[in-house]
Amino acid sequence: LLPQGLRAFALYIQAHYLYLKGEYGPSAGLVEGALSMGAAAYPIPALYLHLVAVMDYMSLKQTEKARAHLLAAWALAQPDDLIEGFGEHHGLLGGMLEAEIKPAWPEDFKRVIAITYRFSAGWRKVHNPETGHDVADDLTTTEFAVSMLAARGWTNQEIAAHLRISPNTVKRYLSAAMEKLHISHRQDL
């Protein structure tokens, strides 16, 4: 049997797998159960569990639950500067870093984004040849976040409210992203 802390991390991996399969509710339930049964005592696995909960709840458009998990993860990360996971998961967090971390902790946000760019460059080197699908590497992190939300069916108004920007700014981000991706329709995101 794995030690308790590793079991908690294994549950993160299982929850992430469910997320990738589009099973957001079961993934969120696994996370909530793991955290309530003692995983919260292990800061690093708990941080990663909270991050996958953000991913799940953003996919379910339950932004308040996503926000609560993001801020719980951030509280765990701050004392020891454990921000790597935020950079690793940026693209899956549905703009939550832009909505919550950027306004309150702008310098930390810049460091997270620097991690995101480094992580993404390495990830694309593995992902693109393995899958045969190119992941865009020239979008800004905000263009990517806005595009991900749009691809998940969020309206410009919903994205604007979530990111606390104007709908016109959302349109500009989407237009820039679509131009860089050489696509002309939102559904192609």
Regions found by a protein language model. Give the residues of each.
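Intrinsically disordered or compositionally simple regulatory linkers and C-terminal tails
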Residues: A104-V135
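Amphipathic alpha-helical segments of tetratricopeptide repeats
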Residues: L2, E32-A39, A72-L82
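Helix-turn-helix DNA-binding segment
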Residues: R124-S175, E179-S184, D188
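Residue signature of alpha-solenoid helical repeat architecture, marking inter-repeat boundaries
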Residues: G5, I44-P45
